Amino acid sequence: NLDFNQNYKLSVISRIFFILGITIPFDIRDIKHDQLKINTIPLVFGVGVAKKVALTFLVIYLCIECYLNLEVFALNFIISASLCFLYSFFIISQLNNNNSDYYYSFWLESCSISLLVFLIITSILL
């Protein structure tokens, strides 16, 4: 049984992985404008690797969230986290160097609020 401190730490770690996962794509957007002195994941390792790292961070986020919420069987949160993961995963997997600024400004930015939206929807429906 997880104690409060461990739950809190895992929850913070989970959020960090989610935030990292959805911010790396902005480095992909900025690759045309970044100077070579700035070492970002897309500049150093390439766009493909950056996308894989971002998606891996999202997988880690989902694993931690499911682990934390299966113990208390918070079904609406598990479903919401899964939907947030799927939504963010899809948006990031569709990234390329030619996406418009609107793609980043709307679709990618909406990943950050998607968990709240899915939580509200699942709370109403379940």
Predicted regions, residues:
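Helix-coil boundary and interhelical linker segments in multi-pass alpha-helical membrane proteins
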Residues: 1-13, 63-77, 120-126
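Generic hydrophobic alpha-helical membrane-segment signal
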Residues: 2-3, 11, 15-18, 34, ...
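Structural motif marking the loop-to-transmembrane transition
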Residues: 5-13, 49-52, 74-79, 99, ...
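Lipid-exposed faces of alpha-helical membrane segments in multi-pass integral membrane proteins
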Residues: 13, 17, 53-63, 82-86, ...
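Solvent-exposed interhelical
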Residues: 16-58
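Juxtamembrane membrane-interface segments at transmembrane alpha-helix termini
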Residues: 23-29, 90-98, 117-124
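Interhelical loop and helix-boundary elements at the membrane-water interface
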Residues: 38-40, 44-51, 91-117
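Transmembrane helix-loop-helix
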Residues: 56-101
